[in-house]
């Protein structure tokens, strides 16, 4: 399977938190994705980039917090995350190299 350069625009980065690490026991991996990425695009990108079989994709959007910076009111960017469920026997180790 060859990776299309557009797949790199869909997957921004892996999410490495305690909660995301606990999901690996359930064969799930969490990624930050582009805000306009759809579930089929995310599934295709993960399958092509990591050479695994994806059985499901759940997405969530975390709204950015309102903050004050130098007396000005601003807002952090919204973040879209995808929880990708892998087929039995497939794994993605995103914690190597830390």
From Swiss-Prot:
One of its GO terms (cellular component) is ribosome. It holds the Pfam family Ribosomal_L23. Keywords: Ribonucleoprotein, Ribosomal protein, RNA-binding, rRNA-binding. Coiled coil: none annotated. InterPro entries: Nucleotide-bd_a/b_plait_sf (IPR012677), Ribosomal_uL23-like (IPR013025), Ribosomal_uL23/eL15/eS24_sf (IPR012678), Ribosomal_uL23_CS (IPR001014). GO terms for biological process: translation. GO terms for molecular function: rRNA binding; structural constituent of ribosome. One of the early assembly proteins it binds 23S rRNA. One of the proteins that surrounds the polypeptide exit tunnel on the outside of the ribosome. Forms the main docking site for trigger factor binding to the ribosome. Belongs to the universal ribosomal protein uL23 family. Part of the 50S ribosomal subunit. Contacts protein L29, and trigger factor when it is bound to the ribosome. PANTHER family: 60S RIBOSOMAL PROTEIN L23A. This is Large ribosomal subunit protein uL23. The gene is rplW.
């Amino acid at each position: 399977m060859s990776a299309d350069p557009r797949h790199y625009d869909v997957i921004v980065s892996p999410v490495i938190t305690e909660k995301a690490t606990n999901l690996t026991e359930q064969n799930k991996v969490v990624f930050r994705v582009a805000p306009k990425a759809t579930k089929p695009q995310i599934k295709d990108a993960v399958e092509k980039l990591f050479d695994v079989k994806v059985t499901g994709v759940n997405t969530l959007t975390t709204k950015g917090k309102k903050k004050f910076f130098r007396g000005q009111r601003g807002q952090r960017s919204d973040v879209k995350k995808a929880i990708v469920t892998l087929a039995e026997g497939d794994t993605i180790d995103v914690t190597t190299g830390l």
